[in-house]
Amino acid sequence: MRLTPACIFLDTNVYIIGAADSESPESRILEWVGFGRKGSAQVEVVVSEELLEQISRVARRLRNKDWGGELLGRIWQNLNVCYVLLDDQEYSELELSGVIPREDIGVYLTAKAGKAGCFVSSNHKLIRVLAQRTGEFECFTPEEFVNQYLL
């Protein structure tokens, strides 16, 4: 096990899958960052309005709006949150460049603005793009992150 990063970004799918499936690697990551217990957070977790809206939207679609509210409440109450604002100009430039898939620009900019050391996502396409083209942070699937840092 390596020294764990001080600041990480967790993609929408990590929150949704982790909250829905207690046996998943995503759930293990959420437990590690303190999602289930107030005051237990050691690591800083980067979030933005865009990420929180995605979590709420997906949770509402999969279950209901109450579950979405519960997830957001746990993020704000239990995690050591680093809230960042996204730069509209940078968003537009990335959209025009085509380097990062359009639907993933917001999550990328969130991790970048928060100076995350790690980016964790089940989105394999996004991880490959970020790792190959930007190299700004270590990119992991939830399984890779658990194996690298939590075992």
Where are these regions (language model features)?
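Short, well-structured N-terminal submotif of metal-dependent ribonuclease cores
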Residues: M1-V47
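Acidic, PIN/NYN-like endoribonuclease modules and their adjacent C-terminal/linker elements
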Residues: R2, G117-C118, H124-L151
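Short His-Asn-centered micro-motif
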Residues: L10, E49, V120-N123
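Alpha-helix capping/helix-boundary segments
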Residues: V14, L51, G106-V107, K125-I127
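Short catalytic/ligand-binding loop motif for oxyanion handling, primarily in non-cytosolic enzymes
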Residues: I17-G18, Q54-I55, I127-L130
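Residue-level signal for well-ordered alpha-helical positions
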Residues: D21-S22, V58, R133
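PIN-domain endoribonuclease scaffold, especially VapC-family toxins
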Residues: V33-L94
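Active-site neighborhoods of divalent-metal-dependent phosphate/nucleic-acid chemistry enzymes
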Residues: V81-F119, R128
